[in-house]
């Protein structure tokens, strides 16, 4: 009886180790292509397990969640995934492309980044720049230039498209006062 238990336990630990090795390879391949949050890696690995289970025609193993968590902890320990680093890089990138602070926060929250980490990332998004008084105002200007809104429209269209331009900035997550100041700016 004891021998049968030991053989079963040994087989299960080998299966668990093999699953962990496959998951680690999948996670490394994913991280090789994308900088990612912990939650995104977790979702990707769960989808991978479901796909493997469907392909094999077997249900997903009970130990698969534990294997995913073990792989994620190992990746965190080695520094391959770090939510703070991911949030900082993504916040700067989105800020430089003209996204508002509100839109950046929503984007990061949707990817499972903790609110405290999001706050730190939003604070650090302008560290590279010199003395930003209003980072959202600068982002709104970038957005307006990119979308040809407000002062970037032909002069004959500015007055008739003013409300539409303000609405576009509002939908992008900018406040009414920032939208108004950007749309009414002179080039």
Regions found by a protein language model. Name each.
Residues 2-187:
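An alpha-helical, amphipathic repeat domain used for nucleic-acid recognition
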């Amino acid at each position: 009886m004891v021998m049968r238990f030991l053989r079963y336990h040994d087989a299960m630990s080998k299966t668990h180790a093999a699953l962990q090795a496959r998951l680690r390879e999948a996670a490394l391949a994913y991280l090789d292509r994308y900088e990612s949050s912990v939650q995104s890696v977790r979702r990707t690995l769960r989808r991978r397990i479901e796909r493997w289970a469907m392909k094999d025609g077997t249900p997903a193993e009970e130990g698969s969640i534990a294997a995913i968590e073990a792989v994620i902890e190992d990746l965190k320990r080695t520094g391959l995934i770090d939510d703070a680093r991911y949030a900082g890089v993504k916040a700067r990138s989105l800020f430089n492309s003209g996204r508002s602070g509100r839109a950046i926060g929503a984007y990061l929250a949707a990817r499972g980044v903790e609110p405290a980490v999001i706050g730190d990332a939003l604070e650090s998004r302008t560290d590279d720049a010199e003395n930003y008084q209003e980072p959202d105002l600068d982002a709104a200007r970038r957005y307006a230039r990119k979308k040809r809104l407000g002062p970037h429209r032909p002069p004959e269209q500015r007055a008739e498209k003013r409300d539409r331009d303000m609405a576009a900035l509002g939908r992008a997550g900018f406040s009414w006062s920032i939208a108004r100041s950007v749309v009414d700016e002179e080039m």
